[in-house]
Amino acid sequence: MMRRVIVLAFAAAAAAGPALAAEPDGKALFTRECGICHLQGGTGTFMLGRRLGEANAMLEARRNLTAPYVKRVVRYGLNSMPRFTRAELPNSDLDAVAAYLTRAR
């Protein structure tokens, strides 16, 4: 009986494995993939400050970003920002970054 319970427990855990996979962490992805340019002191932050004013320089603090806009800029680039392909930043990661940058504040 005990052996049967253990086998069933392992089978249930194995079946639930993919469903328990963690969703991408938007903040961690932003820091890792975008932070070199878009955190304090980065080139992207500097350029946005010059173009849009200091209030809009830090992406994490902006309230006027939308997810479609973030995704479009990342995929196609804008001004001096290069585009990022799906191989460089998969759609699921881009979705997580866009959700992080447009979260309710």
Language model features with spans:
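Electrostatic cytochrome c docking/interface patches
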Residues: 15-29, 45, 67
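Extracytoplasmic electron-transfer domains, predominantly the class I c-type cytochrome c fold
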Residues: 53-105
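Non-catalytic alpha-helical scaffold/packing segments enriched in small hydrophobic residues
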Residues: 9-10, 25, 29, 96
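Bacterial N-terminal signal peptides
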Residues: 5-16
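Bacterial N-terminal signal peptides that target proteins for export
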Residues: 1-7, 82
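Periplasmic/extracellular electron-transfer cofactor-ligation site
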Residues: 27-55, 72, 79-80, 103-105
